[in-house]
Amino acid sequence: MLKQLKLGTINDLAILLSLRQELTMAKQNLQPYKRYPQIPDYAKYSKLVAVAEERYEMAQKKLGMEIISFDFRTNEVKFTIMNTGEMFVVRKVLNGLTNKFEWMVM
């Protein structure tokens, strides 16, 4: 059975994915400084991680969605809608007719 998603849901998912990517990048920037927390850059990057985590959590609550997993190789995202508990798997694929990337429900 193919589940239909509203365009707003896909837009919300894109926002949530960008915030998750921001959080991932902030954590990667902090990684080299974890061994030496006395370095001033550690405080700067740990604050960026805290802000990114807060923004991501707020967006999850506001949008009512939670990303379960994201596979960079296949561009496949598994997420749930918190209100209904429905789980969706979407994949970003290239449409051969329009030559644009589109989200397809799996």
Q: Residues of each region from the PLM?
A:
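Charged, low-complexity interaction regions
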Residues: 31-42
